Every structure is written in C-alpha cells, then in structure tokens.
C-alpha cells in the first residue's frame, strides 16, 4: 500500500517554522534609573610611541577606529546638584534654557532662524559678557555603535553619514587653536581689538529630545593638569559649513595619574529645556577655569532612540575686563 503525503506535511518538512519578530519595545514611559554614578572605561590619548596617532581625522570612519589608552573613571550624577557648578570655577554649568526652535536637523534653518540669537542672549545673561559671536553649530543624531557597525568595511578616510556622540576625552581647541580660530572667524582688525580684553570659547550643548543613552560627561578643569594636555592637529577632509575649520588644534588628554584624579560629572535624563555650557578656552590666567575635557559614554541602562543633540560654539567677550 502506498502512503500519501499531504501538501501541508510537505511544506512543514521543507520550510522550518520561524517565529514572527517581536514587536519593538515600547519605551515611551520608561525612565532611567536614578543611579548616583557610573564607573566607565574612557578613551584617553595613546602616546604615539605606543601606537597612538599624531593626527585626529574628524568626521571620518577612521576616527571611530582610533587607538586609545583606556582608564576606568567614576562619573558622578549631579541631577539635583546642578547649582553647585559654575563656569569660572569648574569650567562648566547646567542651565535652564527654553527655545522657540523645535527642529534642529535643518542646518540652514538653525543658522538663519532665531536660535543663534537666543543662545547669544542666554550666554550674555549667564556670564555677564558684553559681546557674543556664534561660530556655528553641530547636530548629532546617530548611534555610535550602530554607525561603527554600518561603516565597518569602509576605508578610514570615508566621511561618516552623520554625527555620532564623541567617545574620546578631548577639548575642542587648544590655547593655540583658540587664537587661530579667533582670527579665522573674525575680521583681523576686530580680532586684534577683542584679543586685548578677556575672551573665551564656550559651547552650548543641548538635547533635542530627552537623553536616554550616551550622555555627555564633563571633567572639572581643576582636576586636569597642564602636562596632561597635548596640542593635537585636528583635520577634516571635507569642511562642514561653520562647524569646524579644515585644520584645527585641539587638546588630546592623557590618562590621569591615579584612578580618582580626574573628577567627572554628568546630569541624567537631560531634556530639551536644559543646556550644558562647556568652556573650551578662556584668556584669563588668574586661576579661572580655562578648559574642560569632555566625552560621551555608554551606560548599561541605555535605551530608546539614538541621542540627538545640538552643540553651538560661541566666542564670548568681556570688553570691560583685562585679558589675563
């Protein structure tokens, strides 16, 4: 007697059952745990004699493959303690700042709209400055790990498709780089005049939506020694309009001498109505904080959409104060 195989049995034998994909996790009501600190491995400067690179190629796939010397540091959560920090002592400050702008991805809309003016007025109010000149801004909206994976087969000098959070300890301008930037962005006569009184470069960093992953940490300027700062050439193969010059000098930062030397801080769950002011340079040499190393970092509690943020770089001038 010949057995009969039904159509259903044949299909079941030929095509293994595959469960449908799980729906994405609904994180709309999820909250970050209130942890007082994270112990995180940070990427510090690797000495070129030990295999480190002499040049930082900004905006490239190669930057994401750069070799570093890593150190585990403690990053304290200052949510609720924001008022304890200020620009002149620590080099950074958290402020409340509402904006009328809701869309940050359109470069020209930000440049031509009200946002730069709002930032300038806020900086004058917070710092007492007499003049603020906005250099430009940078919008970040890509996840670091996802971008690293997507670009894994691309050559080092390939420009990334967008901006991810920066995951290495640095200061955007060295002392030399700040002066160079001043003369690049302002008319020579005006730059010479403004250099005679106190001036600074301050970045205004703000989330575009609530931060649930890859937060930004800042290091107390007093805890970083001058001999841990290395003037490093920063090159960009293709200039981003107003975001960075093609050639820049920045500080790469050496690892701390002891695990607790560098004092790192962040504020959890920053929202669109909060901003972090980060000092990159100050002409004052009287003990005023002059530069702040910073870096983003992953946490085991990260969730949600990629972190989206905008960083506005500004010259800040006090024409009624001595330069140093």
From Swiss-Prot:
Pathway: Mycotoxin biosynthesis. This is Hydroxylase/desaturase CTB9. The keyword Hydrolase does not apply. It comes from the Eukaryota. Belongs to the asaB hydroxylase/desaturase family. Disruption phenotype: Abolishes the production of cercosporin but accumulates a red, cercosporin-like metabolite called precercosporin. Residues 1-11 have a biased composition (Polar residues).
């Amino acid at each position: 007697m010949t057995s009969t195989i039904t159509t259903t049995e044949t299909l079941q034998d030929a095509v293994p059952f595959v469960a449908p994909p799980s729906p994405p996790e609904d994180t709309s009501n999820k909250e970050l745990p209130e942890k007082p600190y994270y112990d995180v491995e940070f990427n510090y400067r690797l000495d070129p004699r030990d295999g480190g690179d002499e040049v930082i190629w900004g905006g490239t796939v190669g930057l994401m493959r750069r070799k570093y010397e890593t150190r585990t540091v403690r990053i304290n959560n200052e949510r609720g303690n924001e008022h304890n920090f200020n620009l002149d002592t620590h080099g950074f400050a958290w402020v409340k700042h509402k904006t009328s702008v809701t869309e940050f991805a359109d470069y020209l809309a930000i440049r031509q709209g009200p946002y730069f003016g709002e930032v300038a007025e806020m900086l004058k109010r917070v710092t007492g400055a007499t003049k603020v000149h906005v250099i430009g801004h940078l919008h970040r909206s890509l996840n670091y790990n996802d971008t690293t994976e997507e670009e894994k087969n691309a050559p080092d000098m390939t420009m990334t498709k967008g901006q991810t959070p920066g995951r290495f300890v640095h200061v955007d301008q060295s002392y030399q780089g700040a002066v160079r930037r001043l003369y690049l962005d302002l008319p020579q006569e005006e730059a010479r005049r403004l250099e005679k009184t106190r001036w600074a470069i301050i970045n205004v960093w703000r989330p575009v939506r609530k931060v649930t992953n890859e937060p930004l940490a800042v290091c107390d300027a007093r805890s970083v020694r001058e001999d841990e700062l290395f003037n490093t050439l920063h090159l960009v193969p293709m200039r981003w309009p107003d975001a960075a010059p093609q050639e820049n000098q920045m500080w790469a930062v050496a690892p701390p001498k002891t695990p607790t030397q560098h004092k790192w801080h962040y504020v959890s769950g920053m929202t669109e109505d909060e901003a972090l002011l980060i000092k990159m340079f100050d002409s004052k040499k009287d003990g005023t904080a002059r530069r702040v190393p910073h870096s983003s970092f992953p946490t085991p509690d990260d969730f949600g959409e990629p972190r989206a943020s905008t960083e506005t770089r500004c010259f800040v001038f006090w024409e009624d104060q001595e330069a140093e």
